[in-house]
UniProtKB/Swiss-Prot annotation:
GO terms for cellular component: zymogen granule. Residues 1-20 form the signal peptide. This is High choriolytic enzyme 1. Residues 21-70 form a propeptide. Its cofactor is Zn(2+). The gene is hcea. Zn(2+) binds at H169, H173, H179. It comes from Oryzias latipes (Japanese rice fish). Binds 1 zinc ion per subunit. Glycans are attached at N53.
Amino acid sequence: MNLAPSTCLLLLFLLDIAQALPVWDEEGHEEGHEEGDGDDFVDITTRILTSNNNTDQLLLEGDLVAPTNRNAMKCWSSSCFWKKASNGLVVIPYVISSEYSGGEVATIEGAMRAFNGKTCIRFVRRTNEYDFISVVSKTGCYSELGRKGGQQELSINRGGCMYSGIIQHELNHALGFQHEQTRSDRDSYVRINWENIIPASAYNFNKHDTNNLNTPYDYSSIMHYGRDAFSIAYGRDSITPIPNPNVPIGQRNGMSRWDITRINVLYNCR
């Protein structure tokens, strides 16, 4: 039986909504959702910037460690990416500091498992590998951009960063991904309200010569700033989506479908 035109339009509308939703895990839970988290409307950027407020680490864009050996905002060469094994998997060794509790370790490793099954990325406990991520609890949530070489720290502060969405965000930085709103084509999708931004923090909104991997701008990306990042005052948005200013940005739960697609494209996952 043929579907009525109105029914077809409804199905297309629902499909469009579904494409913007965060990814769900195999148990049917929303990836990155924190059980019992009462502050459900705080976006990832706000949590990260709040946690990083007192850090003495030199950071770019709020949570990227400023490197000394390359252009911070350029991670296109193969030396910046983690190597793929002959079996097609990108194995990234890690160690987790003993200062974390068992529950905190479970949260960190649960965020790492969000990459399994949907990408070729595999975070594995380090044995004796030279390149590895060291997860530590310093003052703030931050990461290197891409593979640094040797030991590289990824800070997940026990007090302010212990959320799966934040951990996935920082792991994406470690894979080589930048913030969504710094894309070279961002001016077609968001308006930066410079007058509402703390002057000393305005550099965090500079555009970069990014490799967009032939993917569309993603308002729902876990790598997108919230609308009031680095704002001078409550209610003074620093970022406004265009043409529809009501489009949600700065979600807090987990990787979007385009986040996952980009990992698969960048690392040539099969």
